[in-house]
Amino acid sequence: MARVTVEDCLEKVDNRFLLVMLSSKRVKQLFKGARPLIDNRGANKNVVVSLREIAAGKIGCEIGKKGR
C-alpha cells in the first residue's frame, strides 16, 4: 500500500469521527513505545502508521457492551 487514504480506512471503520478517535488513540500508544503492527521500513510518522494499521484491518474498535 503506497498511500493510505481516508476512504481506505472507512472501509474498516464506518464513521469518520470514530476513525479520528481510533487513530489518535493508536498514535498515543505508538508515541509511548508500542510496536507498529505493520512493516514500517519507511520510517513513517505515527499518524501514517496508525492509518495504515486501520486500513490493513490490524486494529479496530467495538461499540457497545463488548467494547467497554
Curated annotation (Swiss-Prot):
Q: What keywords tag this UniProt record?
A: DNA-directed RNA polymerase, Nucleotidyltransferase, Transcription, Transferase
Q: Which GO terms describe its biological process?
A: DNA-templated transcription
EC number of this enzyme: 2.7.7.6
Top-rank lineage group of the source organism:
Bacteria
Q: Which reaction does it catalyse?
A: RNA(n) + a ribonucleoside 5'-triphosphate = RNA(n+1) + diphosphate
| InterPro entries membership | DNA-dir_RNA_pol_omega, Pol_omega/Rpo6/RPB6, RPB6/omega-like_sf
Pfam families named in the record: RNA_pol_Rpb6
Q: Extract one GO molecular function annotation from the record.
A: DNA-directed RNA polymerase activity
- Give the protein's recorded name: DNA-directed RNA polymerase subunit omega
